[in-house]
């Protein structure tokens, strides 16, 4: 990993650790930068806002690639649901726990409500482009991607708040519903 990547990961790790310890709203960007051993200006070169430290979604590229690889004649909603199912099924146990921890922080932070929607727009755009690449029209692609991301976000936040189910079970249920199974 190059210097940029190491710094980026150090900032993300410092942020996630502090958010878990103190809560998102009680953690400042200066504290994140200090914990990572860099200046606050460096933090903002990597993450334009504090919310991006927590909300930047590392799964968008793999989900979009999985959607693009779905059969061209498959309905857009089903293609998105199945592409996401395939992408998320490859998560390691460590990624699952990290995702639950991160989503719990997000679910508990009142000030992130608008940030979640802004972050989801990036995911919707990536999935929309994937659907268009497989031949869907723009309006159909946008509607399908938006519907699946909204439903999946709800399911994931519910899963993060509870210890009663596994990620696999929560995803299966949500994606079955969204994909019309």
Spans of model-derived segments:
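Basic, helix-initiating cap at the start of DNA-binding domains
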Residues: 1-22, 26-41, 55, 62
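N-terminal intrinsically disordered/low-complexity leader segments
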Residues: 1-4, 103, 175-176
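Amphipathic alpha-helical segments enriched in hydrophobic/aromatic and basic residues
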Residues: 19, 28-29, 50-56, 77-80, ...
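Hydrophobic alpha-helical connector segments
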Residues: 64-101
